[in-house]
């Protein structure tokens, strides 16, 4: 049985009030010369595009391996800070299915998709987190910001960007969470997907949330409202009693099984892998429904 990862409050993080470059190096498992080497900023990145299955392409800003390794270690340090109940990615033990399941049974579900979240998260926000929230020295906050950003924003290919996208707006999410708690709403955040649900969710309150986003320099480009009908949250259908895969997921599985029967060689192996992946996703949804049915201890 997997063990639960230990977390600690923010003010008990080894990064909290960090003022020594030597201690930073020890935390990241590198030497001071290696720290200088990975602090060269934009020169350590390569940009390219990869095609999306849905069409179009995704632009990737990929850090060189030594920098990426340091970013991954820093991400683990930040992920060890106890997350709020509403944060679902990147949090160990939480996923897109459990994110959707939080909204089961609510009559109204409202979803906002933040536009270009990583490119629109500026370095000044990242510096603010390291300096004002973690309380690092100004010098180290600047150094950490250099390690974390590319061309003045969070890079799309960095393993550090998902957790920093949350922490860079630590104050914003705190205010949004306080508003939702005061109104009895359910709030979840899954990277750039913000979902609020309840028996009723007023337009006025959603406007207040949007105002918080706009004041922070963020914009949404998709808004979905579901009232007294199944909602789709992070690719999962949310109903009154449980979660389910969308019909397109079942169609993909049907097509993949057909390909297994029809194809040969490497193409068949690829189809088998596709079937296994889709079955795993459906099983994850089934497990989540079993948790929902389990009586609270």
Where are these regions (language model features)?
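Right-hand nucleic-acid polymerase module
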Residues: 1-51, 55-112, 117-158, 167-178, ...
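Surface-exposed helix-capping loop/turn segments at secondary-structure junctions
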Residues: 84, 180-187
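Short beta-strand
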Residues: 186-190, 222-224
């Amino acid at each position: 049985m997997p063990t639960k990862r230990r977390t600690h409050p923010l003010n008990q993080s080894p990064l909290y009030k960090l003022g020594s470059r030597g201690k930073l190096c020890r935390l990241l498992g590198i030497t001071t010369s290696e720290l200088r080497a990975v602090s060269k900023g934009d020169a350590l990145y390569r940009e390219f595009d990869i095609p999306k299955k849905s069409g179009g392409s995704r632009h990737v800003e990929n850090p060189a391996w030594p920098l990426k390794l340091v970013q991954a270690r820093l991400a683990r340090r930040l992920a060890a800070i106890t997350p709020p109940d509403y944060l679902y990615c990147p949090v160990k033990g939480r996923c897109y299915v459990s994110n959707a399941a939080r909204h089961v049974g609510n009559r109204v579900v409202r979803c906002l998709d933040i536009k270009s979240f990583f490119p629109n998260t500026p370095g000044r926000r990242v510096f603010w987190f390291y300096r004002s929230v973690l309380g690092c020295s100004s010098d180290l906050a600047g150094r950490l910001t250099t390690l974390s950003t590319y061309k003045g924003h969070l890079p799309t290919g960095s393993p550090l960007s998902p957790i920093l996208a949350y922490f860079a707006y630590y104050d914003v999410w705190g205010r949004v969470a306080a508003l939702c708690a005061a109104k009895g709403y359910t709030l979840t955040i899954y990277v750039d997907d913000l979902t609020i649900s309840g028996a009723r969710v007023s337009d006025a309150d959603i406007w207040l949330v949007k105002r918080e986003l706009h004041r922070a320099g963020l914009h949404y480009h998709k808004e979905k409202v579901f009232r007294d009908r199944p909602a789709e949250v992070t690719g999962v259908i949310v109903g009154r009693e449980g979660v389910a895969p969308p019909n397109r997921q079942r169609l993909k599985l049907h097509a993949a099984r057909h390909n297994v029967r029809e194809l040969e060689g490497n193409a068949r192996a690829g189809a088998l892998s596709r079937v296994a992946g889709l079955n795993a996703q459906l099983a994850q949804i089934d497990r989540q429904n079993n948790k929902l049915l389990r009586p609270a201890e």
